[in-house]
């Protein structure tokens, strides 16, 4: 798989990415986040979800992200965020710091998920919640418009994403209990191809130029006939540090 430079992608992420519909509400409700909570997002990128949690609850929000350009874009949010350089497997916070540790569309970049989960477990308060938002095989196969117009992304994503049962197994090995899965789903009307033309999804950088060009041409042709019903699905995988 071709390596991606997320410093180069930061501008497009900031331009096109928004919090997933329904996800922040689910996070706040499931984890019971309040203004008294301390929340960590690992691999926060441009921090859209972290900023939304802060905006919704007033919680203290810390984001860890290795890309300097991603952190620069994240700092543009009006919400007060504590942004730090770092990697998932190298989390080094005092024991029992956080009420919630979360990551969104990040776990497939982590080479040693168990090590990350162990570090996150230690950083959580007893009773604290852990969340990783990822994609299931089914969701990857049924992404619209992605899988329809850029089918080469399916195998690319299968090569990147860990199977959800394997992640759940590692969470259990790390000590987490109360494991829980929830698919967050929404549909919307896609009116233009801009975010796909700009390759604001990392998987589009990992397919061939001819496959990309053919997909864009087909997408534009269908959009010329009217908007396309698209979907957004994310699998929320939860665990909890026992009391």
Segments from the language model and where they lie:
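Class I SAM-dependent methyltransferase SAM/SAH-binding core
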Residues: 40, 46-90
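Conserved class I S-adenosyl-L-methionine
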Residues: 1-34, 48-52, 70-73, 131-158, ...
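A conserved beta-strand element that flanks and buttresses the S-adenosyl-L-methionine
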Residues: 102
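Short catalytic micro-motifs in class I SAM-dependent methyltransferases
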Residues: 105-106
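A short glycine-rich, Lys/Arg-flanked "PGG" loop and its adjoining helix->strand segment in the class I
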Residues: 114-126
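Conserved Class I S-adenosyl-L-methionine
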Residues: 46, 179-243
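Short alpha-helix
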Residues: 159-174
